[in-house]
Amino acid sequence: ADKAKAAEEAKKKQDDIDRKKAEVRKRLEEQSLKKQKKGFMTPERKKKLRLLLRKKAAEELKKEQERKAGERRKIIDQRCGQPKNLDGANEEQLRAIIKEYFDHTAQIESDKYDVELEIIRKDYEINELNIQVNDLRGKFIKPTLKKVSKYENKFAKLQKKAAEFNFRNQLKTVKKKEFELEDDKGATEGDGPAAEEVAAE
């Protein structure tokens, strides 16, 4: 009897162990399925990736700004040259330095004028090519529309209405005066013969 009881208890313990193992296995499988459904890009990974991309973009932007600033300084140094030492220079030397700066500035202005003319010519050529391409495609170039504020349109309409209102009032006033003048004129003409008859009597 004791052996049977001990065997039954051992069986119960084993069943409990097996049941707990099955529960743990089931829980792990469910978690694994949830992870598979989420995929590789979890919200945490997406957030980290966004931060990395922003950091990378900021670094690239900073490098580009530094590169442009370096090129600008280099071009300024090339075009303007190093500053002249004016300490102890006499009038003749100062005149020579000023003339050198003046000639250099005139040359830069001439180069600038040539570049502007070249830009205008290139823009004209690009415009002509665009017209030819649109003609071949059977399309028309859309005109550049001027941006107008909606408040300006409303204000213009109100001004127009006010002008029309004032014009009508003026017309009414003029008509009243005309009628009054005609009435006065008719009364004067009507009173003329009667007054003459009264005077004759």
Swiss-Prot record:
Modified residues (N-acetylalanine): 1
Key words, A-Z: Acetylation, Actin-binding, Methylation
The keyword Membrane is assigned to this record: no
GO cellular component, one term: troponin complex
Compositional bias segments (type: Basic and acidic residues): 1-33
Spans annotated as Actin-binding: 135-148
Alphabetized GO MF terms: actin binding
Region of interest (Troponin T-interaction), ranges: 108-117
Matching Pfam families: Troponin
Function: Troponin I is the actomyosin ATPase inhibitory subunit present in the thin filament regulatory complex.
Note: There is a 30 residue long N-terminal tail that does not occur in skeletal muscle TnI's, but is present in cardiac muscle TnI's.
PANTHER family (UniProt xref): TROPONIN I
Protein name in UniProt: Troponin I
